[in-house]
Amino acid sequence: QAFENVIKQSLANANLQPTDIGHIHGHGMSTISADRGEAVAINKIFGNQTPVVAAKSYMGNLGAGSGSVEIISSLLALDKGTLFKTLNYDTPDPDCDIQVTNSIDTPAGSSFINLNASPQGQASAVIIKSLQ
């Protein structure tokens, strides 16, 4: 529920619709329960068409540094115009009906939402939109 709440609030604060978001940078903890909960929230708001990436697939969980690295990763993707693939994503979980990116030619769009969560159940989301 926390992810759903922060996604909705972030979209409202930015005066954007889900279709305005080019990609989603998921928290992506790679645990069954956390990933399913995040995927349900993403699917409920965005459906399964908006591409989802996870930088943690490259470096693991960096703790408090994860959010900054994830934002930088998505900013670089915006600049390049394409997303990076999510490593080790081979078999989609039918309980996680989202569009996880597993190729390097997926368009990044001109905006993204970055999702993060704490072990205590808090969640945050930030939306960044290109000026171009």
Language-model regions, residue ranges each:
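Conserved "HGTGT" condensation-loop signature of ketosynthase/thiolase-family condensing enzymes
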Residues: 1-132
